[in-house]
Amino acid sequence: MSGRSGKKKMSKLSRSARAGVIFPVGRLMRYLKKGTFKYRISVGAPVYMAAVIEYLAAEILELAGNAARDNKKARIAPRHILLAVANDEELNQLLKGVTIASGGVLPRIHPELLAKKRGTKGKSETILSPPPEKRGRKATSGKKGGKKSKAAKPRTSKKSKPKDSDKEGTSNSTSEDGPGDGFTILSSKSLVLGQKLSLTQSDISHIGSMRVEGIVHPTTAEIDLKEDIGKALEKAGGKEFLETVKELRKSQGPLEVAEAAVSQSSGLAAKFVIHCHIPQWGSDKCEEQLEETIKNCLSAAEDKKLKSVAFPPFPSGRNCFPKQTAAQVTLKAISAHFDDSSASSLKNVYFLLFDSESIGIYVQEMAKLDAK
């Protein structure tokens, strides 16, 4: 071509291509002008809007793919998208009023029905059978004529269970009656040797009233009470618990990483508090150290002949452990500990969870444990 042919034609780039996004910027601009015609729409508004929508779509697709993989499905279904949104706290708040077509609903199964479905006879008996037995005994005692004396005894025994930590009735109540009021058991799994792992939901302020024999307190080397779990325990236990921790600091000294120390739980419903020095995320062999920490907590509970112990989520305060990694390491360590030990005094292990994201992660990881 000669030079007289004029300028070479350039292919016109779309607004989306110039902005580096996939979603149509021009269409979003038209929608914004159509819906908000009274206001001035800047040129960057639809670009930013397209970028945000694209990021959210990619995030949901990634989480839905993880849900499909965990459920051993090759394709992503609307159900997986619903689970992905429900398991992410921020997405759940953002899309709270959104209905996903053909996504179904989130299961809220009562613990009694869940126990029947899985066939754990021991759990269904402990939950269902005691109330009718007690009522039946009261009715038969009334026929014999001893109404007042026999009706008064069960009331006093119920009140004394949380306080008298040295009696055997407390250990039976923690294992049979569950962790108490304000705690919801979402699901459970029985291991080979009979230990039960239970996902328990509650508010962090109720941790002091949890009826277990041992509560794990993730802390630092100085056994301080500055994190959320420590503050909740101090608030529930009061000055008595604070003095007990001070005595433990003097006698035990600073804890090594993964070391566990046991103290009396003065002012709490539990018998003992197991303080453990958890590692910092990003340090050398932090996952191995966290696994060792959990095993040391279980060994400390077994040394005290405890029958039940409660683990709060280990991404606690300054250690910055990712929730998914911490849940995987926790379940792996507990399963390995009970596989290696031929006999253990522990019968119930509770995972005390406070937010929906942690619950979703533990449900997925428990399902993987079932598959193994």
From Swiss-Prot:
All residue ranges annotated as the Macro domain in the record: 184-370
Signal sequence residues: none
A GO cellular component entry from the record: nucleosome
Keyword Iron assigned: no
Compositional bias annotation for Basic residues: 135-161
Subcellular localization: Nucleus; Chromosome
Keyword terms: Chromatin regulator, Chromosome, DNA-binding, Isopeptide bond, Nucleosome core, Nucleus, Ubl conjugation
Span list, region Disordered: 115-182
PROSITE patterns registered for this protein in UniProt: MACRO (PS51154)
Positions of the Histone H2A domain: 2-117
Crosslinked residue numbers (Glycyl lysine isopeptide (Lys-Gly) (interchain with G-Cter in SUMO2)): 239
UniProt cross-references to SMART domains, sorted A to Z: A1pp (SM00506), H2A (SM00414)
Gene Ontology molecular function: any one: protein heterodimerization activity
Cited InterPro entries: Core_histone_macro-H2A (IPR021171), Histone-fold (IPR009072), Histone_H2A (IPR002119), Histone_H2A/H2B/H3 (IPR007125), Histone_H2A_C (IPR032454), Macro_dom (IPR002589), Macro_dom-like (IPR043472), Macro_H2A (IPR035796)
Keyword hit for DNA-binding: yes
GO BP: any one term: sex-chromosome dosage compensation
N6-lactoyllysine PTM sites in chain numbering: 7, 9
One Pfam family of this chain: Histone_H2A_C
Chain's role: Variant histone H2A which replaces conventional H2A in a subset of nucleosomes where it represses transcription. Nucleosomes wrap and compact DNA into chromatin, limiting DNA accessibility to the cellular machineries which require DNA as a template. Histones thereby play a central role in transcription regulation, DNA repair, DNA replication and chromosomal stability. DNA accessibility is regulated via a complex set of post-translational modifications of histones, also called histone code, and nucleosome remodeling. May be involved in stable X chromosome inactivation.
Assembly behavior: The nucleosome is a histone octamer containing two molecules each of H2A, H2B, H3 and H4 assembled in one H3-H4 heterotetramer and two H2A-H2B heterodimers.
UniProt record similarity statement: Belongs to the histone H2A family.
Identification of the protein by name: Core histone macro-H2A.2
Organism: Homo sapiens
Gene that encodes it: MACROH2A2
